[in-house]
C-alpha cells in the first residue's frame, strides 16, 4: 500500500529482516475539529466496533481521547492483539496499515496504538479514560487491566520520588 504524503510528514523505521517501513501520517492537529452529536458519534463508534470485531487477531480495543468528550480531529484507538499474530510481532507496521484501512472505511482520521507492549503510563491512561470498543476475550482484557493497574500503582512511589528528585525537592 502506498499513500502520497509530503516528505516532512514521513519517518522511517527499521523492521525485522532489515526492511524499512515508511511511516506516513497526517498532522491531525492541523485539521479542523469535528463537532458531532452524540447520535453521530454513536454511529461512528458502532461502525468502528463492527469493523474491528471482524479481525480475529484483535482480542479487545478501546476508544480514548477527544472523540469521547467533545470536538475531535481523529479517533484514538488502543488495541490488544493475540500474542501469536503478526501485528504483535511488528506493532508499528500493523498500526500504520490498520489506520489506513479504518480511515478508508470510516472517512475519519484514525490513530491506532497496539497496547501489548505499550509504555505503562500510556496503557494506564487508555484504560483510565477510554471506553471498551470491542472485547472478544473478556478474560484477556481483565487480565490486562489488572496487570496494568497493579504495575502502575506498584510503580507510583518510585515515579513520585523520581519527580521530586528531578525537581531537587529531595535531599
Sequence positions of predicted segments:
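Catalytic core of pol beta-like nucleotidyltransferases
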Residues: 2, 8-60, 68-71, 82-171
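Short, well-ordered beta-strand segments
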Residues: 76-78
